[in-house]
Every structure is written in C-alpha cells, then in structure tokens.
Design a protein with these regions (language model features):
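Non-catalytic interface/targeting segments
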Residues: 1-59, 70-71, 96-143
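Amphipathic coiled-coil/heptad-repeat helices and related helical stalk/stem segments
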Residues: 60-64
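Mid-chain, well-packed structural core segment of small domains
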Residues: 65-99
Length: 143
C-alpha cells in the first residue's frame, strides 16, 4: 500500500501549535525500505483562503483536502486540528503530535508504520484519530 504523510510545519520545518490548515507548508513523506523519506515541500496555498468570513471554513478545508488527495497523501500530522477534523478523518488518518521536531516524529512513525498501514487497510474512511506523545503512538479504542 502506498502511504504518504503530510506534516504541517513552519518555515523552519518545525511543528507549531496551529491548526493543520493554518500551517505555512507541508512536508510530504513517503515510505521507502520501511522508512519515512522526505519527498517534497509544498506551500499551503489555501492558508489564508476564506478566513475573513469564518475561521476553519468548509471551503478552505475542502481546498486543502483536495490538494493533498491529489498528491496521494493519506495521513496528516499536526500539533492541532480545527473544526474540520470530522471532514478530515473521512479522507485521512489524522495524527496529533506533541513535539515540534520533525525528526522525532519521523522516528516514532517509522517504528509504528504497521499500525498506520493496518488502519488504512481496515477502514476505507472515518479513520481513527491517533496521537504521538513521548514517542508513543496511541489511538482511542472503542468499546
């Protein structure tokens, strides 16, 4: 399965406590030989779209979703997600992280890839929300 990640980062390639859609750019990672490799850096051209009317607008959310889907992305990684999280998890696995350092997150994800692939293969939509805190990948377990 082809898995691509979009990391929401600032100009210094660090995660920030901003909503996913408010990030400056996305680092796009793919899996090669069992490791995450940086494929490209993409500016968030929808960053300031439609924000004069409503923060977290549906129009902006859909623009970002469509752009990332066109790139083949299926996992989003950020310190925060906004009100569009329900729309996001219909198309992507969202992962909330607590570290600003991309390398730390890359290392954790590399060791936990099987969980991400399993989620993508078992659910075609309405993915679970994952978190990475202190180097540990977690998800909510439904009873």
């Amino acid at each position: 399965m082809d898995v691509k990640f979009a990391f929401a980062v600032n100009s210094n390639n660090e995660f920030q406590k901003n909503h996913f859609g408010d990030t400056e750019k996305f680092l796009i990672y793919g899996i090669e030989s069992g490791k995450l490799n940086l494929l490209s850096e993409e500016l968030n051209v929808s960053r300031n779209m439609d924000e004069t009317h409503e923060h977290g607008s549906r129009k902006k959310g859909l623009a970002i979703i469509n752009s990332l889907k066109d790139m083949g992305v299926n996992v989003l990684v950020s310190m925060q997600f906004g009100r569009n999280i329900k729309m996001i998890n219909e198309h992507f696995i969202p992962i909330i992280i607590y570290s600003e350092q991309t390398e730390e997150v890359v290392n954790t994800l590399t060791h936990q890839l099987h969980w991400i692939v399993d989620e993508l293969e078992s659910a075609p939509e309405n993915y679970k929300l994952f978190t990475i805190k202190s180097g540990i990948l977690k998800t909510v377990v439904k009873k």
